[in-house]
From Swiss-Prot:
One of the protein's GO biological processes: proteolysis
Phylogenetic classification of the source organism: Archaea, Methanobacteriati, Methanobacteriota, Thermococci, Thermococcales
Protein's organism: Thermococcus kodakarensis (strain ATCC BAA-918 / JCM 12380 / KOD1) (Pyrococcus kodakaraensis (strain KOD1))
Subcellular location: Cytoplasm
Pfam families membership: DJ-1_PfpI (PF01965)
UniProt similarity note: Belongs to the peptidase C56 family.
InterPro entries: C56_PfpI-like, Class_I_gatase-like, DJ-1/PfpI, Peptidase_C56_Deglycase
Ranges of residues in domain PfpI endopeptidase: 1-166
UniProt entry keywords in alphabetical sequence: Cytoplasm, Hydrolase, Protease
Protein name per UniProt: Deglycase TK1284
């Protein structure tokens, strides 16, 4: 399977780096997309290679999507192409994993109405206002959507996401 990660500078380091390596460990191809090719830097200084610019991504070529948190989703959600990629993959029923502030992109894509999920508590009201039921749990699985709250939930988050990739 081909898995896409959407992010930008300011990502929560472990929320991108752990899924990147964990998904590869399962034998899947993982691609990072951002505003442009090159590198992005996390909140704590880790850098990650960017394989594709948002404008180069064809969502039909990917089987699953990961939306890490940190500050990155605040700016990723402003990119129309990134939001369109997210909307298409979510609505096509492809596995989508979000953590922390990652659901901000799902909110902008308008796909959360009637769904159950979680996020960092600081965007709880935003998730609810988008029509989702917010649940305070380390991981929530609702169909193709796997969501978690923060880095402390990484292991449960990836455990459940990897199940959807099998």
């Amino acid at each position: 399977m081909k898995v896409l990660i959407l992010s930008a500078d300011g990502f929560e380091d472990l929320e991108l780096i752990y899924p990147l390596h964990r998904i590869k460990e399962e034998g899947h191809e993982v691609y990072v997309a951002s505003f442009q090719r090159g590198k992005i830097t996390g909140k704590h200084g880790y850098t990650v290679n960017v394989d594709l610019a948002f404008d180069e991504v064809d969502p039909d070529e990917f089987d699953a999507l990961v939306l890490p948190g940190g500050r990155a989703p605040e700016i990723v959600r402003l990119n129309e192409k990134a939001v369109a990629i997210t909307k298409k993959m979510f609505e096509d029923g492809k596995p989508v994993a979000s953590i922390c502030h990652g659901p901000q992109i799902l909110i902008s894509a308008g796909v959360l109405k009637g769904r159950k999920g979680t996020s960092t508590v600081t965007i709880r009201d935003d998730v609810k206002n988008a029509g989702a039921e917010w649940i305070d749990a380390e991981v929530v699985v609702d169909g193709n959507w796997v969501s978690s709250r923060h880095p402390g939930d990484l292991y449960a988050w990836m455990r459940e996401f990897v199940k959807l990739l099998r």
